[in-house]
A protein has these predicted regions:
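Hydrophobic transmembrane signal anchors and adjacent membrane-proximal interface regions, especially
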Residues: 4, 178, 228-231
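Proteins synthesized as precursors that undergo proteolytic processing into mature forms
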Residues: 1-169, 191-192, 198-202, 206-207, ...
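Glycine-centered loop/turn motifs
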Residues: 169, 176-184
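Single conserved hydrophobic/aromatic residue that forms the stacking wall/gate
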Residues: 230-239
Length: 239
């Protein structure tokens, strides 16, 4: 029979034990729940990429010390230069489901981390530096993580859709094959991205070295997406 876990001080929950651990470690070091969630979300980008990553979005409901609820809707827009004629000129009758010409949107995840972090510093006494919050994820991507059954199953079920997507095979296949459970998965480029965010700040994703690298890759692939379109509103009271 299922039972509820109970805790007096704090509780950290994530779909992967390493994400749970890094969030718990931040709390033990005196961080607040927002800081713990940023660290945990960063780790999810490494260990749980089939569900969320820096290429995704995030949505926050944060309670302040007066129990007021503040919301962050960190969902990026689609490109502003895409319409039906864009696809017709390229010979498409429908929008591709995968690849650089699919219905991609500007990833809002990192922008959401920054807004939540700034809110934490201003309103919740946040004091853990971004360098610490991203460190565990950076190291995990650099040193490698064990492939889980869930990740392997998702790679298997989506292989036919993703195998021709540029970059997929280099990262997620081992000698051209899906890795086995327990195989070490090392993601150097993701580790380097975290390193740049640690060095230059989260905004680097949208206007710095990380931004320029992503835009260069998007241009090479022929994608019309532009990360400079990102504009996430400040935390607001939802009601």
């Amino acid at each position: 029979m299922l039972s509820s876990k109970l805790s007096y001080n704090y509780m950290m929950i994530a779909p992967h034990h390493l994400a749970t651990k890094t969030g718990s470690d931040i709390l033990k070091e005196g961080g607040n729940v927002v800081e713990a969630m940023i660290a945990s979300a960063a780790m999810i980008s490494v260990v749980y990429p089939h569900m969320n990553s820096m290429g995704g979005d995030n949505f926050w409901l944060i309670s302040d010390k007066n129990k007021n609820i503040h919301a962050i809707d960190s969902c990026g827009p689609a490109s502003n230069n895409i319409n039906i004629d864009f696809y017709k000129k390229l010979g498409f009758n429908s929008i591709p489901s995968r690849g650089p010409l699919s219905a991609l949107t500007v990833p809002g995840a990192v922008a959401g981390w920054k807004l939540a972090y700034d809110f934490s510093v201003k309103n919740l006494g946040g004091k853990i530096p971004i360098s610490r919050l991203l460190f565990d994820a950076e190291q995990a991507a650099k040193e490698g993580i064990a492939v889980t059954k869930t990740l392997r199953n998702n790679l298997k079920s989506k292989l036919n859709q993703l195998v021709e997507v540029v970059g997929f095979k280099d990262i997620y296949l081992k000698n051209g094959k899906i890795p086995n459970v327990g195989d070490r998965l090392i993601i150097p480029k993701l580790s380097n991205t975290f390193s740049l965010l640690i060095k230059n700040g989260l905004q680097d994703f949208y206007s710095g070295d990380v931004f320029r690298k992503i835009i260069s890759d998007l241009d090479i692939l022929g994608s019309p997406l532009n990360l400079s379109l990102i504009h996430i509103s400040e935390p607001t009271r939802p009601y």
